[in-house]
Amino acid sequence: PQAGSEAPNLRTRAELRDGRWVLNGAKQFVSNGRRAGLAIVFAVTDATLGKKGISAFLVPTNTPGFRIDRSEHKMGIRASDTCAITLDDCSIPAANLLGERGKGLSIALSNLEGGRIGIAAQAVGIARAAFEAALLYSRERVQFDKPIGEHQSIANLLADMHTQINAARLLTLHAARLRSAGQPCLSEASQAKLFASEMAERVCSKALQIHGGYGYLEDFPVQRYYRDARITQIYEGASEIQRLLIARELKHYAL
């Protein structure tokens, strides 16, 4: 659980005993842990090799020793359960090693680009839902004898929201097209996730503001969009990590 963004700092261990892998450790923030029938677990198989000593395993969740400790109570994305799990002498067949021994980190990193593009798309979707709710409300809510959307202050907010959503969408599509074509897109995926996730929080905040007091009520969906948007800056690599990756890739930027 302590590894966080420092992925190589895993504490879960896997030991080969009598032809079977035995896993011990704990994992935090496991998405859909209560619903999954199969978990991909990363564990240290050789502590002397650092990040080259991490391997990936396929672990059926009904395996003895695989225990779900609790479901977390989150401010957002409540449709997806998030769990903490413990592996206590969890024994699996040797064939459940995913890929090669010591290649676990490579397997994890190979999926990050797609994951980050997916989170960028999620952020765009949340922001668009918030924008459309605000746009509809601005047409229906009348103040000072006209819909609030006709007041310049609200119109300017809506214009900014619309522009930022489209910019994030194009960044996301660009990264997705590169990945679909099999081209490198580490920086592009990070740019899409960074911009889209921070954009989503801004847009959802403005959407809530446009709704006024009603936006703060659970009867209106914008409060949910606001809560759901925040996680996109955290999982699949926090915004701070994305900035580090983008800056690192600038070393190869051709002038």
Describe these PLM feature segments.
Residues 1-32:
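Compact, aliphatic and Gly/Pro-tolerant "microcore" segments centered on a short helix or tight beta-hairpin
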Residues 11-13, 38-42, 56-58, 82-89:
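Conserved hydrophobic/aromatic beta-strand scaffold that supports enzyme active sites
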Residues 20, 24-68:
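A short core secondary-structure module
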Residues 7-9, 16-21, 84-86, 103, ...:
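Alpha-helical interface subdomain recognition
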Residues 9, 62-93:
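Flexible, small-/acidic-enriched active-site or ligand-binding loops
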Residues 28, 35-36, 46-48, 62-64, ...:
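Short, glycine-/Ser/Thr-/acidic-enriched flexible segments
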Residues 1-5, 29-32, 46-48, 74-81:
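Short Gly/Pro-enriched turn/cap motifs at secondary-structure boundaries
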Residues 89-107:
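Long, acidic (Asp/Glu-rich), low-complexity accessory segments flanking structured domains
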